[in-house]
C-alpha cells in the first residue's frame, strides 16, 4: 500500500475551495518560488524544526528539559546563547529529540499516512462538509508529486461522496494529472507569471509545462479556479496581471473564479526555523489601494477576478 507524507491537515478551512473543507497539505514541491509561505512543504522528506518561543531549556524548574540533547546519538543539537542549533548535515530526522522534548519545542514536520488512515481522519468532519457544501482539498507543496497515493485515496473519498479539490501549481508531467482527474471535482490552478524567463527566475523552472497543463485541464472540462499570488517585484506588475487575464479569457473557458492573493509575510518565521534564507525578508505588505489597482487591471479583462488577503 502506498503511503503519503503530509505537513498539515487544516480543518475548517474556508479558503481552499467551496464550503468548509479539510485541506491536506502534502510534502514535496517541484517549484522553489521565492515568496513561498509554506517552506516546510518544499522537501519531500521529513524536517526537524525548533520553536524558540516554546523552548524551556533555560528554565531551572525543568530538570529534564535538556533530554533532547542527551538522546541525540548524532550530536546534531547544540545549545548556544542564541538558542538551539541543528546540524542538518548530521541530523537523521529520527525524531528522538522531538519525542523527548517536554515543551514540543522540537518538532518533526511530516506525518506518514496510508489511504485508509487518512480517509478515516477526514471523515471525522463529514457533517461540516455536507452542511456547507464543502469537502476535501489536496494541496501542498505539490500534491501531484505524490500522485500514486492520490490514485489510492481519491477513489476512497469518492466512495464516501466527498467533494474533492486539487490545488496544484501545474509543474508536473501531464500523465500524473490524467491518472487522477476523473475523481476530482475542482482544480485550483496557480498561474503566477506568463513570461517564461521571468517564471524560471522566480520558481526555478520555465512555465511551458504549466501553461500546457492548464490548457489540458480546461479541455478535460474540469471546473477551475485560478490562483495568482500577487508578489512585489515578481508577479504584481500590471503587464503580467493583464497577460494572465488574457490567457484565462482566451484559453481557459472552464475558469469559474480567479483569486488574486495578496502577498503575505507570515511564512518568514518558518524559513528561520528551517535554516533557510528568505528572499523577501524586508518586503512590506501591499496597501489596499495597491491591491485594488491590480484587481481592476485583472477584472477589466477577466471579470471572474477577485482579490483577498491582508494589507497594510
Locate each region found by the language model:
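Short glycine-enriched, charge-decorated loop/helix-capping segments at active-site entrances
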Residues: 50-53, 200-206, 275-283
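Electropositive phosphate-/nucleotide-binding environments in soluble metabolic enzymes
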Residues: 23, 27, 49, 66, ...
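Auxiliary Fe-S-binding modules of radical SAM enzymes
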Residues: 1-18, 218, 230-312
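Conserved Radical SAM active-site core
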Residues: 42-183
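Conserved AdoMet/S-adenosylmethionine-binding subsite of the radical SAM
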Residues: 116-273
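Pocket-edge positions in alpha/beta enzyme catalytic cores
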Residues: 47, 83, 110, 142, ...
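Glycine/serine-rich loop-strand microenvironments at binding/catalytic pocket rims
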Residues: 27, 31-39, 45-46, 76-108, ...
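N-terminal cysteine/histidine-rich coordination modules
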Residues: 1-43, 47
